[in-house]
Amino acid sequence: MDIRREVLRNVTLCQALEPLGQKPGLTSRAEDASPGTKLEYFVIAGVNSAWAFYDLADRVLAAGRQPDCIFDLAYEAQAASVRGRLGGKVNYGQINLLTPLVTAQVLIFLEAGTTSDVEAILARTPEVLRHTTERDVESLERFIHLGYDLSARQHERMGRPKPLQRPHLQGRYASVWEAAQDFLHVHAVAEYTQGYPYCRRIYRFLLHNLEIGMLPASELIYRFLLPEVGRADVLADMISVGLYLVLTRHPETVLFP
């Protein structure tokens, strides 16, 4: 198995598939999408950004350990995501969640030669964050600021300029883990510092409901978790990660009969 190609495939698929499910409370992107959330924006962003995750897997393999920096590739993924489209930072949250997850996955592949143990991958992510560096903190800040820039441009195009408060991390924290402790109110940060509890629940639900189909199952878990999570866009990002985990667990299974 070429883990780099598997990562590329699954990152592409999970981001392209997630918006195909019908989710009440979230724009039906195929029918009544707002100017910033057209279905094609999500598909294009997912395809464009996936190659950075191929590079991330390749970097971990080449180093034989966790590299000195991984979040620069989150920045590269977000920068690439806008090629050929308008819209805002439509897959920002997915990139943020997938970066430490893919790193953990490839590290486990180096150690065990397999990627089928999803629970081990999820459990490894806090350790990945603890082993990040000041270079990661700098890159994470650039990634966050780029997301703010993309959002601001979209608001300007829509005639609704919106002032944004940009967090500043560089020079204040020695690792992404350390920085995360001051931002646990952010859904994605709480998720990846705690081993992805919501993504795990979504993954398990999808896994146990494969007979009804991945997309119908994703619609059901969305309805179930939305009152608890409270934000439709955040939950959509988590569902994308859940899809990624099922694709990782079942690389050869027919999941879309």
Descriptions of predicted regions:
Residues 76, 80, 100-104, 124:
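Generic beta-strand or strand-like secondary-structure segments
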Residues 81-88, 92, 105-112:
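Amphipathic alpha-helical interaction segments
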Residues 68-86, 226-229:
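Short, hydrophobic/aliphatic alpha-helical segments
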Residues 72-76, 92, 119-123:
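Alpha-helical scaffolds flanking conserved acidic
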Residues 1-68, 106-229, 246-257:
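Phosphate-rich cofactor/ligand-interacting catalytic cores and adjacent structured alpha/beta frameworks
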Residues 86-100, 229-244:
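Conserved phosphate/anionic-ligand binding catalytic regions in large, soluble enzymes, centered on
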